[in-house]
């Protein structure tokens, strides 16, 4: 790197950033598509133009990411709303079933829950036809 022609650390940093940006975008575009050498002979206008192109590309990426994130947030909000509604409906149904169940049915249900704790296996057993209460669905 030929940095002796630059007088301030800022000029050196800008030179290094430009070289990095050019090589990065060249690799993205597939090889030596961009062959620009930045030195004292490069005009200020071309440096500014390159800066503007890089900034535009970064803004475009940022805008696309923000749009995608907003879209995903809306989808997740809708899923949360649907789950809250379903949860509320199931809680109302559970309360109704508890009020309609006989003490014997409640006792039988509690006895199934006690030894197994959360009863994921209760629906799998085919012994449920004994309950005279009918289907909850």
UniProtKB/Swiss-Prot annotation:
Residues 101-137 are annotated as: Disordered. It comes from the Eukaryota. Residues 76-97 are annotated as: Leucine-zipper. One of its GO terms (cellular component) is cytoplasm. The keyword Phosphoprotein applies. The modification Phosphothreonine is found at residues 125, 128. Induction: Induced by dexamethasone in lymphoid cells. Induced by Il4, Il10 and Il13 expression in monocyte/macrophage cells. Transiently induced by Il2 deprivation in T-cells. Expressed in T-cells. Expression inversely correlates with T-cell activation, being higher in resting cells and lower in cells activated by TCR/CD3 triggering (at protein level). Constitutively expressed in lung, intestine, kidney and liver, most probably by resident cells from the macrophage lineage. Expressed in thymus, lymph nodes, bone marrow, spleen, lung and skeletal muscle. GO terms for biological process: negative regulation of activation-induced cell death of T cells; negative regulation of skeletal muscle tissue development; negative regulation of transcription by RNA polymerase II; regulation of transcription by RNA polymerase II; response to osmotic stress. Residues 1-60 are annotated as: AP1-binding. Keywords: Cytoplasm, Nucleus, Phosphoprotein. The keyword Phosphoprotein applies. Disulfide bonds: none annotated. Residues 128-137 have a biased composition (Low complexity). The modification Phosphoserine is found at residue 102. GO terms for molecular function: MRF binding. Protects T-cells from IL2 deprivation-induced apoptosis through the inhibition of FOXO3A transcriptional activity that leads to the down-regulation of the pro-apoptotic factor BCL2L11. In macrophages, plays a role in the anti-inflammatory and immunosuppressive effects of glucocorticoids and IL10. In T-cells, inhibits anti-CD3-induced NFKB1 nuclear translocation and thereby NFKB1 DNA-binding activities. In vitro, suppresses AP-1 transcription factor complex DNA-binding activities. The leucine-zipper is involved in homodimerization. Belongs to the TSC-22/Dip/Bun family. Can form homodimers, however it is likely to function as a monomer. Interacts with NFKB1. Interacts (via N-terminus) with JUN and FOS; these interactions inhibit the binding of active AP1 to its target DNA. This is TSC22 domain family protein 3. It comes from Mus musculus. The gene is Tsc22d3.
